[in-house]
Amino acid sequence: MNNKRHSTNEQLSLDEINNTIKFDHRSSNKQKFLSFLGPGLLVAVGYMDPGNWITSMQGGAQYGYTLLFVILISSLSAMLLQSMTVRLGIATGMDLAQMTRHYLSRPIAIIFWIIAELAIIATDIAEVIGSAIALNLLFNIPLIVGALITVLDVFLLLFIMKYGFRKIEAIVGTLIFTVLFIFIFEVYISSPQLNAVLNGFIPHSEIITNNGILYIALGIIGATIMPHNLYLHSSIVQSRTYSRHNNEEKAQAIKFATIDSNIQLSIAFVVNCLLLVLGASLFFNSNADDLGGFYDLYHALKTEPVLGATMGAIMSTLFAVALLASGQNSTITGTLAGQIVMEGFLRLHIPNWLRRLITRSLAVIPVIVCLIIFKGNAAKIEQLLVFSQVFLSIALPFCLIPLQLATSNKDLMGPFYNKTWVNIISWTLIIILSILNVYLIVQTFQELQS
């Protein structure tokens, strides 16, 4: 990576929201914190999207509470990586897509753009599938119609954006807490053993020695750290009105944006733990192998003998509501991330509605095509979700490495560059994640072929 300076005529990242939300560095710490409360919510969505659900619940159903430790480590790793994107966005005034295009050679930057665009599409595919399945479960809407309905999210997003980015943050926050409270209720009803849950946060050697547990563990790790979140976060932290030329204000902005990020990622951590605990408390040592997808989970909750007919119906319906809320949340953030990647790499100057419609269509079209080819076969569509998660594993190093190189560059970051301990941990994480993701990809294709 060269040390070319950030061009002063660089287009602002997400210019319609950039520098629009008031942040007064002279106000109290409480006011500063409240000013920066919000971007982390949009990032947290990616850590509890529909792609994570099956992995977490399967992990609990098949191996009890053992994998809670893996969720903890994954969440702590995510906090570190997201804090690096916060520093990149605030210190440089660039998002990760702009930085990658600006500081890598053109041929390499183009390759990175293609991979980033495909990663956004893969992320969106999971959300479209999750939302379509939720609509089918709740209202018996055909999957193909449900997938088409998700296109309307684009226009809903455009409508809400007219009233300010704070409205987006509020809606996303409401949907997140809807999911959180649904799963708190469901876990409470399922009555897990507290001692067993707490024991799950202690590392167990079988996570490494048992191939089945290791495979699920890798799935949890791979589904937790999402490429689109790194692009998204580096952009939306710039929505606050801190001085772009005052390092003291930048330092305060980084501090409170990081606090916001860590709080919201802690909520995502709790949701993922609740999913695993729910799977363990209801299905461990029973019909765990039958929980292959959203439909399986829905019907398993509905017919679970421990719950009874009435509570089973309530639990399964709430599960579908939470799936819809999660899918809608993720489509909002995925669309924004797609806009950031398209603008950042290509400098496209097209109307917002068209840019977002293109981003959404690129995700919906593959789902529609597969629905037509497989004649609405739900199992095949859920398999498409698996493929989308595998591609995210492939794409992850292509955004982690530029992020690491940029944030460790003192000429680029100024006083906000990575400290030595951060570099050691982040490089270790990148290497481990890359190795684990290669293993996960191989294992997934072997599973699909068997």
Curated annotation (Swiss-Prot):
An MF annotation (GO) of this entry: symporter activity
GO cellular component, one term: plasma membrane
Domain of life: Bacteria
Protein's membrane topology: Multi-pass membrane protein
Cell compartment(s), UniProt: Cell membrane
Ranges annotated as spanning the membrane: 34-54, 61-81, 108-128, 141-161, 170-190, 212-232, 263-283, 305-325, 361-381, 383-403, 422-442
Matching InterPro entries: NRAMP_fam
Keywords, comma-separated and alphabetical: Cell membrane, Ion transport, Membrane, Symport, Transmembrane, Transmembrane helix, Transport
GO BP term, pick one: manganese ion transport
Function text: H(+)-stimulated, divalent metal cation uptake system.
Family indicated by similarity: Belongs to the NRAMP family.
Protein's UniProt name: Divalent metal cation transporter MntH
Gene for this chain: mntH
